[in-house]
A protein has these predicted regions:
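Solvent-exposed interaction patches of small proteins and small membrane subunits
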Residues: 1-174
Length: 174
């Protein structure tokens, strides 16, 4: 883990919390659109592309947080053709003086959203598999909640580390 000051850790924690709040807003939007599909199944095809984009955005937001931590604390993103998958895997294990950011279970569930994001980027909306989309939407609240819980725990660790650094600075100044 790269050495960081207490202030830098607090700033990173604040940036992560900002992203988490955006993900919570997205959750409301996913539920709203899914409600439209449930309310009027005959128009479901109209809403599936919108829902797919929202699930794409969900994983992108999760990955944005992982990228912040990778660049700020780990020092760099993984490289190579499979860097997205490796980034996710790296954060499900303790590494270089930092705890795991994600539980193994959360990381496994996020793999499905990573794979789906790839599909959304490479297919036409009308080619989407509605059954897969429904399964991801059904799992979304629990996966989103688990991600939020895991990340908040990690942010708590960063804030405790920042407090220790501040106490050490105060002690050395005395």
């Amino acid at each position: 883990m790269r050495e960081k000051s207490a202030g830098e850790l607090h700033e990173l924690a604040a940036d992560i919390e900002t992203e988490l709040s955006k993900l919570r807003r997205l959750e409301q939007d996913v539920l709203l659109v899914h409600g439209e599909i449930t309310r009027d199944p005959s128009r479901a095809h109209i809403f599936y592309e919108n829902l797919a984009l929202k699930l794409h955005n969900f994983y992108t937001g999760c990955e944005r947080i992982l990228r912040m931590v990778a660049t700020e604390l780990n020092g760099a993103l993984p490289t190579g053709f499979d860097w997205h998958r490796r980034l996710l895997e790296r954060f499900s294990v303790e590494r270089e003086g930092r705890p795991a950011l994600l539980s193994t279970t959360t990381a496994q569930h996020l793999q499905e959203y990573l794979a789906f994001r790839h599909i959304v980027r490479n297919l036409y909306g009308f080619e989407l598999d509605s059954a897969r989309l429904e399964r991801l939407v059904d799992n979304y609240p629990s996966v989103s909640s688990a991600f939020d819980t895991d990340v908040r725990s990690f942010v708590g660790w960063m804030r405790r580390l920042a407090a220790q650094l501040e106490n050490a600075e105060t002690s050395s100044d005395s």
